Amino acid sequence: MPTLLQINVTANWGSTGKIAEAIGQSAMKRGWNSYIAYGRKMTTSKSNLVKVGSKMDNYIHFAYNYLLDMEGRSSDRATKALVRRITEIKPDVVQLHNIHDHFLNYAILFEYLNQTEIQVVWTFHDCWAFTGHCYHFVQQNCMKWQTECGKCVQRNRFVDRSRENFLLKKSLFSKCKNLTIVPCSDWMSSLVKKSFLKDKRIEVIKNGVDLSVFKQTTSNTQSSPLNRPFRIIAVSNVWMAYKGLNSTCKCNRILINNLF
């Protein structure tokens, strides 16, 4: 029986956690074993869960990130324990989601993966994998990641290791011979093709929705208590500029006579 192991910061919690859970359930319906390794925050899962590290590991890793700009470069013992677990599970496919956020040492993980024949699928939910440390660069309008990060414009760190981080990621991720990158949008795909990962196999798979709930229907707007031609809803876990808050407000102004 083939085995899928996914790695994400959460398990069946939040957007990426629920995406991993859905993928695991889909794999199990097709006869696969499913494991999800996670750093923190979880709810009940139908997959086999593998906890990575402890709360103390998370706190120490957070300090490494905040004080030393070393996200993804702490949690040595926790990641070595995960690698040992991977060798026990013997997965046919390792699918990565968000491996940042204070729980995993990506150098230790990729030094292991790069020596194996395991197929690695990495779903890109943000831009962290090909930048010096930021998840999104649009707000800063910074394109250094296309060549080489350094002297980061995000001045919210005591130490700037953006160039060092960028070069380490480039060295490790580029050497993963069985890596397939799965951007969740055409826009993300266009960015990956401008990064140091442009020569990797890139397959766009857009985030899905439950079509039994979200489907096209015919409605009688005149009988609606809202009495509006149509409605627009925008959803985000947190509302910030980089999440599209400004664009949503702009949409409201343009469609001032409609409800969204």
Can you name each region flagged by the protein language model?
Residues 1, 216-231:
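Nucleotide-sugar donor-binding and catalytic loop/hinge architecture
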Residues 29-93:
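A conserved catalytic-core segment of Leloir-type glycosyltransferases
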